[in-house]
Amino acid sequence: MNASDFRRRGKEMVDYMADYLEGIEGRQVYPDVQPGYLRPLIPATAPQEPDTFEDILQDVEKIIMPGVTHWHSPYFFAYFPTASSYPAMLADMLCGAIGCIGFSWAASPACTELETVMMDWLGKMLQLPEAFLAGEAGEGGGVIQGSASEATLVALLAARTKVVRRLQAASPGLTQGAVLEKLVAYASDQAHSSVERAGLIGGVKLKAIPSDGKFAMRASALQEALERDKAAGLIPFFVVATLGTTSCCSFDNLLEVGPICHEEDIWLHVDAAYAGSAFICPEFRHLLNGVEFADSFNFNPHKWLLVNFDCSAMWVKRRTDLTGAFKLDPVYLKHSHQGSGLITDYRHWQLPLGRRFRSLKMWFVFRMYGVKGLQAYIRKHVQLSHEFEAFVLQDPRFEVCAEVTLGLVCFRLKGSDGLNEALLERINSARKIHLVPCRLRGQFVLRFAICSRKVESGHVRLAWEHIRGLAAELLAAEEGKAEIKS
């Protein structure tokens, strides 16, 4: 493919992408395929001679699309949103064209410097404390990670290195192994599974703190666990507070948990993967109160801020906490500016070496939507979730299972877990909408998350009518079974 072909095929691909997204409502949201469907449709080996672009694009529609779950359909209400917007897609195209690997300032100065500035832009949109911003000579700063899971792991490993070095400095004969076997990290019992995985990878104990009636971690429960573990000779070193849990979008109490971590000299990491985008709206910023106590904070613009995956924003108050844990300088990566104090080498802030020019997506989206446009997008999703909540509350057969704060409604049929499992099976088997479940206080609960950029009130109403209809069929069938038994 030469430049002339690229121009022509590029226009065709943009047309295909735009047609796909604008017509996505007409596609079945959840695929009707079985595991292994794709292998028989594709040759067992790569072609010896080139295929044509026309054949490839036809195969996309014939082979790939039947197996796609359409996350951007207005009838997709599962998980949490994954962001999508035309400005971000255009920026991704440019990122692919530039094709730099921005592991250091010297490897691509614009890649590094735009990321630093965009993370400051975003931090100011969130009204983060000044300590988290890079500015021109700040001690903190932001970095784009691949996911919130990565950000949590990076924070845990940095905290682990910091406490090991501190204890070894106080007791020079102390081995790293002796410290590691006593380290304990903590998170709410509602925290994401990636927190547990970070503990496994980091080789430290992770303990779940029981949440309160609103599914939040509170000071009393955390303090009790800390005192118990310290009395047993263990060393608390790391706490993850979640703002907007995956199960029900609950919020740990930072204003209670933060001071405890500060007093105990425990690293506090705040994970707001989904909810963080909402903090650009003044009416939701109070949910972030207490972040001033945190050592690190992250959320995913690639969930709800119209910046395509992957783009997970992470800030730290002290960049030396990261560089102190991860810095390695082989001669082939060194450059003449690294000791100047004027630049950032982001390879020292992350687990991989290589990194894409991801800040281009932020730059395009922030400029083409503006803060007001992004705020309007968030507010619309929140409004739609409250519309669905109202539908549920009006039907005496159903109940809302957790407070609706942002774009997620947790609900269920009043009755057994089996009844709700059967309802979810009917919903997803019909393939008109797509939902996933969670468990709250041991109960099987359905989650309705507002996800698509194109979702409107009409889609929410149709989804609710569909759920109500399937519930009526299910309840009638259950009633019939009961009559037969009696």
Curated annotation (Swiss-Prot):
Keywords: Acetylation, Catecholamine biosynthesis, Decarboxylase, Lyase, Pyridoxal phosphate, Repeat. Pathway: Catecholamine biosynthesis; dopamine biosynthesis; dopamine from L-tyrosine: step 2/2. Pyridoxal 5'-phosphate binds at A148, S149, T246, N300. The modification N-acetylmethionine is found at M1. It comes from the Eukaryota. The modification N6-(pyridoxal phosphate)lysine is found at K303. Disulfide bonds: none annotated. Its cofactor is pyridoxal 5'-phosphate. Substrate binds at T82, H192. Residues 58-178 are annotated as: 2 X approximate tandem repeats. Pfam families: Pyridoxal_deC. GO terms for molecular function: 5-hydroxy-L-tryptophan decarboxylase activity; aromatic-L-amino-acid decarboxylase activity; L-dopa decarboxylase activity; pyridoxal phosphate binding. GO terms for biological process: amino acid metabolic process; carboxylic acid metabolic process; catecholamine metabolic process; dopamine biosynthetic process; serotonin biosynthetic process. One of its GO terms (cellular component) is cytoplasm. It catalyses: L-dopa + H(+) = dopamine + CO2; 5-hydroxy-L-tryptophan + H(+) = serotonin + CO2. Sequence repeats lie at residues 58-115, 118-178. Its EC number is 4.1.1.28. Homodimer. Belongs to the group II decarboxylase family. This is Aromatic-L-amino-acid decarboxylase.
